[in-house]
Regions:
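Residue-level detector of anion-binding/catalytic polar loops
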Residues: 36, 107, 184
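Conserved catalytic-core motifs of eukaryotic protein kinase domains, centered on the activation segment
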Residues: 20, 112, 121
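Short, contiguous strand/loop micro-motifs
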Residues: 13-14, 83-85, 110, 138, ...
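Conserved SAM-binding loop
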Residues: 15, 44, 90, 108-111, ...
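Asp-based, Mg2+/Mn2+-dependent phosphohydrolase catalytic module
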Residues: 1-5, 95, 99-102, 115-222
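N-terminal helical cap/lid subdomain that shapes the substrate entry/recognition surface
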Residues: 2-95, 99-104, 129
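Short, flexible loop segments at the rims of nucleotide/cofactor-binding pockets, characterized by
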Residues: 84-89, 113, 180-182
Length: 222
């Protein structure tokens, strides 16, 4: 297999192990309304999805306007940033891995369901923004993961064929999204087990032992 045309990264749970803090933020959001959110419900209904889709699920059966979605999103994400600010750090091995990709002249992009404020928050705390030639976020798509739209849009903006790209994901909807776009997928087990992510081409605990040659070997041997 030749070098990938691009390496496309999800953000939450893939480049930072922050899903425990998203869970805490959503639980605080729920508690304000006298409700309870379990970790199982988070993994099944929230992780990897856009805030618009999540808010519609949280308030299923209730009338929800775009203004409501924006207000609830701001509330929850402010909680998340307040909770996580003192703890944010990259997944082990991320920075050396980005350096490797850069040294091989592989374009690097981000395709995240997250909002711009959270992406800026990430870049402020983790100094990797110069590696990324493109960032596509959840406000730029109509259909969230597991729909392939965000990955096909990212490839289109990069000017590359999706089937020549490798995506890095941590969630089941994210893996499904990248696969549906025709990409090779490397899953990171920060949130889900290897068994839950078994549809991916390769599964890793973090980026610490990954090399470009090893990545190619992993995704070729499926």
């Amino acid at each position: 297999m030749p070098l990938p045309a691009a390496a496309i990264f999800d953000l939450d749970g893939t480049m930072v192990d922050n899903n425990p803090f998203h869970i805490k933020a959503w639980q605080a959001f729920y508690e304000r309304r006298g409700r309870i959110l379990t970790e199982a419900d988070y993994k099944t209904h929230i992780n990897g999805r856009t805030n618009a889709d999540v808010v519609k699920w949280v308030f299923e059966g209730e009338p929800i306007t775009d203004a409501d979605i924006a207000a609830y999103t701001d509330e929850k994400e402010s909680l998340y940033r307040d909770i996580y600010a003192d703890y944010i750090k990259p997944v082990h091995g991320l920075l050396p891995w980005l350096h490797q990709l850069q040294q091989h002249a592989i374009p690097i992009a981000m395709a995240t369901s997250g909002i711009p404020d959270n992406i800026n928050f990430f870049f402020q705390h983790v100094p990797v923004q110069p590696f990324f030639s493109l960032v596509v976020n959840g406000t730029q798509i109509k259909k969230g993961k597991p729909d392939p739209e965000i990955y096909t849009l990212t490839a289109q903006k990069l000017g590359v064929n999706p089937t020549a790209c490798v995506a890095f994901e941590d969630s089941v909807p994210g893996v499904q999204s990248a696969l549906a776009a025709g990409m090779k997928v490397v899953a990171v087990t920060t949130t889900h087990t290897a068994a839950e992510l078994s549809m991916a081409h390769a599964i890793i605990p973090d980026f610490s032992n990954l090399t470009v040659n090893e990545m190619i070997r992993l995704i070729e041997n499926v």
